[in-house]
Amino acid sequence: MTGVQTCALPIFCQTGVITGDLQREAAKHGLLYAGDPSSADSSMIGGNVANNAGGNKAVKYGTTRNQIYSLKVVTPTGDILDAGARLKKCSTGLCLEQLFAGSEGVLGIITEVTVKLRPMPPYTFNMVCVFKTDEEAFALPNKILKAGIDPTSIEFMDNEALRMTCKFLDMKMPHVDEGCDYVIVTVESFSEDDSDRKMEQLCDLAEENGSIDEFEADKRIWKLRKQFAEAARDVDKMFQTEDFVVPLDKIPDITKQIPELREKYDLYCVTVAHIGDGNIHVLPLNAKGLSPEEWFEKIKAFHRDLFPRVYALGGKMSGEHGVGFKKLEEFALCTPEAELNVIKAIKKALDPNNIMNPGKLVQIC
């Protein structure tokens, strides 16, 4: 990192910088880097940009592409490109920095990033709303957003996910043993009065929608949420994580179909979600000890059934993890031909020799 400029609020960094280190450096100056993937303490900013990582604060601040001013990129043909600029607005040419954000490394090598920083809100609370049913929990986020509470995060953990992660961390949390789900809501404010008002408003709204308890959580709640993937890996080294995304008003429609799919394919699944932006992680776990070949065939069949349902609701198969090679076949099946042709044309124009991450995102051979 080459320094924070507090006037225009950028910070310049090379792509190997750990996301959590970037967050902590900004915080030293009373500033916030809003990109916050659950892997912040291990993921690098270059990977965040290339994958357009989302994370816990995307409800308020957007994904990684919303956090960048500019990129330095080495193209497949050896040119060095400065894409974007440290400007608040620009209508000059194409937004090339946005082309490379989320491109999964197939268009060039990102070497430097100029990211946006924001003033750090001095007041923050984390509220856990406890629900007995998934349906009640999934109905809350849209109502929070419509109420004008302006949350930073709205996260969901079902009871299976809570039990698994609490066991992994040897942690006790309220109502987990009662079979309940959590909706975790973070709200940032610049005044104590505003924070208090929003806390009261949130509690009232949660109770109106079936919450059996609301409690202000300490930092353990984010440890619980962010260690979920490690807990899953402890149970099943071959675990698969889905991260499909649907419009907010379609969350109840798709989540009602998950139990049907679980039963149809005889899958044990746990679910967490960045539910405030419609990004849902359903993790099938190989609880019955199938061979790798049997397991991956079952997951492929599950995908072939799940993704068309997601697209029928106006969603996409990935909200933040990307396509890579694991979802390459399904991406080609679900994506309109005109869209695929544009992606292939861009890839061929920038990488005529197909040397950048071949076989990922799109197949051009």
What is the predicted role of each segment?
Residues R233, K237, F244, F325-E339:
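C-terminal polymerase-core module
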